[in-house]
């Protein structure tokens, strides 16, 4: 009862128990000023530092060893031992055995291994014929999408989408693509470089030791300054024209040069240097590190060598052109210090700056750590931790300072700068180390500091690019924290962030521990090779285009004289001239040559006459040349230049009178027919001037006779002797008669001739087959009557001949003449045989099918029918005296019919083959005629 009362009377103890059972919640630390700690140890403190045995037992628990012996238990095991494999290689031989006749043969397959591309998951270019683009296009067109998916086509040059944006299934063990910054696969090039440099140094040392000369004076190093001398010469050459008038050294005043003649040659343009477009001087030097590595740190020429750069004239020129050379070229000290240093991995660095002066930190901590300074001076003492809160922030101390100044909170105590440099899409990292070297646990947190952004309006999205663990935490005494910062950006640019490392208790009197993150993301140039190739092609195309335009401009400026056209009548033959002068006659070479000889004969006979030149003599020549239309006024002047003025007037008057009489004679109709030539010329006379073609025959020299029969006749009519004139007219009329007849073509219709010959062969073979059958079957032979038909080739009627020359009307007359001839033949047959059909009626429809050119055959057929009708064969009148078996005759008829069908079939086949061959040859000839 007493215990219960006491429990009721003590509620505070119950509350304390409940609070003890509840989980302790962390309370934020309250910023309080630390109480002054005395440095003098009290008695209780000394006793607390004493080491007790109980504490040692807790740290190290003793382990007692067992002294008793354990019984030994033995067991037996059976182990299977395998025989060693035979190390010798087995040789396999293939033996071919004859297959059984029942074995099924498989078709040969030349497609090669089918799984050649399934292992890699795509078709390679060397596995197919042609390009992958065409193969994929054909597969898609045929609907084979499964095969089209196996074809992977590289992006073309103009594709702007990078390969990284396309999601592609990567194989599990595929190696990552090396970075463009990585060194080439020749990973031993640095080793080779060092090995060659070591050999070079050994060679230098051996030569200098053997020759007793320094390494810089060796002959192998004399060419090191050659590039520098050449550059200095170029600078002096460019500076000289500015010092003087420049006419002697400048090409501005020089005239343009000709390659060849000034009229037909080419004008050479000036170069870029002559026009003042000088390219900048290219400086090539060795960096100091390379000079040290090659063993030439201080190269100096020997004092006894009088080189180009030691000449007095050069020294004078340098002083004279010093100001101009300084403007043209920059200082050589700038290029000597240039050096390219790089590596193949993304770059990251850590830079630390301490902004607070160290005097202030030492003054604030000197009062509390006086005894520690004396201890640190002793080398044999172990460094002791700093009492109180303290951090090593990236190696820089950040201690707790007694008292705080509000102005220090605005300043930066320690600034750490983390720099990242990588390609877009690549990740790089850097570490920040913080060590708690004090005796107090320090609570920390990260706060982002705002910074002024001048391009805030241009930024569209705020994407996180820096990644690290920015949660708050506690650093215990002696603990080291590593903060890893990562940077990754999908686009190129320069990015920056600032963070503040806050601590509790506050260090450095409230000064900021700032971490600046600065990153540069570079663009990956994946199309560099393609771009260079495209630039090369465009440059070549541009050069070709410029050259073509320049050539076209040059060709437009060059004017060549036009080629003199050939005269229209340059290729006229004698036959063309004859047909033009005599349109109603037909040219025959032999007859025309005879007329030429006749003309020459009478001309010589006329020239041999020793008569005084009369006024009448030049009239025929004038008429001949005037009628021909080929004489020019210049020839007329030369023809009559020898005549006197009085004779010229008489000649002109008589010529005019002769033309008037000629026109009047042409207008009248002559009743008596003297010759065919005169009738043709009279009909042609009125239209002679109208039908004359406009082209004149100037280029061809006029012949002695102008090939005009009218002019020939007029010249003959002027002969004084009547016998000579009559003889010439007779020969002229005879020639005209021959020229009126059209010459037969040398080659007639080949198809007609071949068909006729084939038909004759068929008839001959039919007759021979009939005779053979009659002889075989024992039938009597038929009596054959042979008629000797006279050759009627020369018997041609004038209407038939006229039908070849004339057109429409002549054709109608020909038809009428043919009808009259048939009518006459029919009346003759009616008189001989009244009751039978006349052969004229039978031949009337066949005569229409015949060609108009084959007049010979028309006459022959008519005469043959007439003879057959007059003398019928004896077979048609008298029957056979011997009796013939009807069965044998029927068999003979059937065999003969079968033979006729076979012969006709062969005839049709041969005709079709020959017709096709002739049509092909005609087409070839027509094409050749068109080409010519």
Curated annotation (Swiss-Prot):
It is found in: Cytoplasm; Membrane. Keywords: Cytoplasm, Developmental protein, Differentiation, Membrane, Phosphoprotein, Spermatogenesis. Its main location: cytoplasm. The modification Phosphoserine is found at residues 559, 566. It comes from Mus musculus (Mouse). PANTHER family: MYCBP-ASSOCIATED PROTEIN (PTHR48421:SF1). InterPro entries: Ig-like_fold (IPR013783), MYCBPAP (IPR032707). Residues 165-178, 810-869 have a biased composition (Basic and acidic residues). Interacts with MYCBP. The lineage of its organism: Eukaryota, Metazoa, Chordata, Craniata, Vertebrata. This is MYCBP-associated protein. Residues 1-39, 165-187, 789-886 are annotated as: Disordered. It comes from the Eukaryota. GO terms for cellular component: cytoplasm; membrane; synapse. Residues 795-806 have a biased composition (Polar residues). May play a role in spermatogenesis. May be involved in synaptic processes. One of its GO terms (biological process) is spermatogenesis. The modification Phosphothreonine is found at residue 560.
